[in-house]
A protein has these predicted regions:
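Bimodal "functional hotspot" detector
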Residues: 1-11, 15-165
């Protein structure tokens, strides 16, 4: 019985550690929203670019329009565009156009979670900062959101929305 419990514990530990590894060797998981627009869904993606800003741009482009099917869709609403501002010392800054301000709260949280979780798989990216039309992204209390990490979001399976911590 103790051996079985130890095996289960080891299995859980190994499964839990998988999420912290970078995925450059075997492609990337690009996050999109489920058909109900209540949670994120992973789609495997094999980029052509190998790293740095070129890879960020390719993944952003894929997120903006590639993933529209019956069971999942892009987290980017129509009209929203994103561009890399800087990638320096592990901090990626992405600038969005003014269409960002038109999103409802649910869509905005899903977009943030999807972009951050997709980009932080890149070895060069530790954290992601959003700007809108060149200005810092502000929360509902008019405070700058600041750097976000994959761990900033609760990754829940099923029909519940992924939450921002």
């Amino acid at each position: 019985m103790a051996g079985f419990a130890a095996a289960v514990f080891l299995g859980l530990m190994l499964t839990g550690c998988q999420g912290t590894q970078k995925a450059e060797q075997s492609g990337y998981k690009v996050f999109c929203r489920n058909a109900e627009a209540t949670a994120l869904r992973e789609v495997q993606y094999e980029p052509e670019a190998e790293g740095g800003e070129k890879l960020v741009e390719e993944l952003l482009s894929a997120m903006e329009g590639t993933f529209n099917r019956n069971d999942y869709q892009s987290v980017f609403p129509e009209g929203l565009t994103a561009a890399v501002s800087t990638l320096k010392d592990g901090r990626l800054t992405i600038d969005f156009n003014d269409a960002y301000k038109q999103m409802d709260d649910t869509r905005e949280v899903l977009l943030r979670a999807a972009v951050v979780q997709t980009m932080t798989q890149i070895t060069d990216v530790r954290e992601v900062v959003f700007t809108v039309a060149g200005e810092a992204l502000l929360n509902s209390e008019n405070q700058a959101v600041g750097p976000m990490h994959a761990s900033s979001f609760i990754n829940s399976e099923g029909d519940s929305i992924n939450a921002y911590q």
